[in-house]
């Protein structure tokens, strides 16, 4: 059996539209062994919340860099617009259960697969201009990149991102603008004391970086 067949999603993919992407969330999660033992799976909870909102998220739990590479292609093929990654991180790298992946390697794995899509990363300290610039260097068409600017607790992360998606999709279930994302992130970042780094295009088409709230 192929690896991707074994990693069946918790949800059913929507059919591709002929033009553009579909406004759904593709969730990839990879935590350490202690998190697994204690069932601390933010992404799994988030998928359940999204289904309650009437969305059709795809959720995959992985453990290795090789599986992440397969997920990158699967995300691209899904035509889903929003990629949410839940994992451990630092100011220079992200981690799967068994492998460390520096920012440059992550950007290479997703090269060409984020055009016209938005990236949300729930990982400690991954919210910085270095990460966003490296991702964009391999994906000129990426719309935005958002991630915590400092370390974030598990309970805060699951409450933060669940609230973000519920609020954003309750306003418009078909799309989210960068201005709307910033407007929703600001009060949440202040409420939880968790600043978020958001990289996006301004009205002139210039790529800009900024930290919101906290």
Q: What residue ranges belong to the model's regions?
A:
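A glycine-rich, hydrophobic loop/mini-helix early in the fold
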Residues: 72-106
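Catalytic cores of nucleophile-dependent amide-cleaving enzymes
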Residues: 98-159
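Short, small-residue alpha-helix embedded
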Residues: 158-170
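Short, flexible/disordered intra-domain loops and linkers
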Residues: 33-38, 94-98, 173-174
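A generic structural motif
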Residues: 60-62, 145-152, 199-201
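Short acidic, S/G/P-rich loop/turn micro-motifs used as interaction or catalytic elements
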Residues: 32-36, 65-67, 89-93, 125-128, ...
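Caspase-like cysteine protease fold
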Residues: 100-109, 171-214
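A domain-level signal for caspase-like cysteine endopeptidase catalytic cores
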Residues: 2-80, 122
């Amino acid at each position: 059996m192929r690896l991707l067949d074994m990693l069946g999603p918790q949800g059913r993919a929507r059919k591709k539209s002929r033009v553009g992407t579909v406004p759904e969330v593709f969730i990839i999660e990879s935590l350490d062994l202690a998190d697994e033992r204690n069932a601390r799976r933010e992404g799994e909870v988030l998928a359940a919340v999204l289904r309650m909102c009437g969305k059709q998220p795809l959720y995959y739990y992985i453990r290795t860099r090789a599986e992440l590479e397969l997920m990158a292609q699967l995300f691209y093929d899904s035509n889903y617009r929003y990629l949410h990654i839940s994992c451990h991180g630092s100011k220079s790298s992200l981690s799967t259960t068994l492998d460390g992946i520096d920012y440059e390697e992550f950007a290479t794995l997703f090269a060409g697969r984020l055009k016209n899509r938005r990236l949300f990363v729930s990982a400690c300290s991954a919210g910085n201009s270095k990460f966003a610039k490296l991702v964009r260097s391999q994906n000129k068409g990426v719309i935005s990149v958002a991630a915590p600017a400092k370390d974030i607790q598990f309970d805060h992360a699951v409450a933060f991102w669940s609230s973000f998606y519920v609020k954003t999709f309750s306003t418009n279930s078909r799309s989210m603008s960068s201005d709307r994302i910033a407007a929703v992130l600001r009060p949440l970042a202040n409420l939880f004391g968790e600043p978020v780094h958001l990289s996006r295009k301004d009205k002139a088409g210039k790529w800009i970086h900024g930290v919101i709230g906290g």
